Amino acid sequence: MELNIKDYKKFKENDLFGRYITNDSIYRILSTYSPKISGYSVQKRPIYSFSCGSGKTKILIWSQMHGNESTSTKALFDCISYILTIDPSLLDSISLTVLPILNPDGAFEYTRENYNKIDLNRDAVDLTQPESRLLRSIYDTLKPHFCFNLHDQRTIYSLNNFDSSILSFLSPSSDKNKLETESRIKSMSVISHVYESMSKIIPGNIGRYNDDFNINCVGDTFQSLKTPTILFESGHYNDDYNREVSRKYVCFSLIYSIQCIANKLFKDHNNYYNIPENKTQLTDIKIVNIKVKQKSTFKLTNLTIMFKEILNKETQTIEFKPEINEIGTLLNTSGHLVLDFKIIDTIFDLTKPNSIDNIILNVNKLRNIH
């Protein structure tokens, strides 16, 4: 069945919203899928999994191995909702095993690492953490035909003309020579299909990650074990800091990927190389022609601002604290928001701790004008 993107609201899981997604957030939806507790985190939080489908082709999917990367978790539940309510025939060809939050401690604390401050995506060989050992155990037992590794990427990623990288993909290397092994070609072929489909929706906003080999990364390890593995990265769109727009596009990408595998819609793997590689030329805000105090006078300069993500445990929401990132000509840098301060008469003393607050006050004024 062809995906009708206008139907998104019909299968979107509206209970999930924002950036702070934990076991508690997903529990109501999860409970409808007959989940089981596959293991426990360092702090003994349950790591849930569920399965659906009776097809011979097995796909293992995990999300939030980095606890603060939650967009793909929302998209994953939207995708499952689509399959079960709109296109259940897919499950005759495939079977899904899903771990929606592999790192529940990191999700709770809104940290990349687990409770022991270990990056689970650098623990694929040593397997020092219970979460890593669980994923490997499920992989070894299931022997999947495909693996989907779901992540979020920072707002810095860009493509040509400073366009935002809203989606990124990677077929991980399986060796230092980046050889096109059979498993790697298969994952490239799936990505090529998704790229062709998604380029009709967000042309110019899809990127490809660097494929330098690191056996400590889970995707590289599974690819080296001859399992086609795909990295999905949820990127940023304009001022959508809750990542609800990106969520939708990741959902579509997951659906296209599963349809590709179920219906054998694989494209020429060489098309994978047509996806532009990600650059890191974006910031959250770029301000040009800002007057900065310099001794007894001032100078005109440019600066960039990045938001630091902070968990407010009272409201259980993520707050975005602005911080000055760079100052200078910054010709090779842009922003998701670019503002010209030439009409702002204020001279900003960047040595004062409240200078960023004054800058943001004027940012908001200019945004209201425009």
Mark where each language-model region is.
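C-terminal accessory segments enriched in acidic
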Residues: M1-D24, L142, L170-H370
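N-terminal capping/interface segment
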Residues: M1-R28, F77-I94, D123
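N- or domain-start disorder-to-order transition segments that initiate the globular core
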Residues: S25-V42
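Conserved beta-strand scaffold positions in the cores of enzyme catalytic domains, especially
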Residues: P35, S49, V98, C147, ...
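A short loop-to-beta-strand scaffold at the N-terminal edge of the catalytic core in hydrolase folds
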Residues: Q43-S51
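Active-site beta-strand termini and strand-to-loop segments that position acidic
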Residues: F50-S54, L225
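Active-site/substrate-binding loop(s) of hydrolase catalytic cores
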Residues: K56-L60, S70-G204
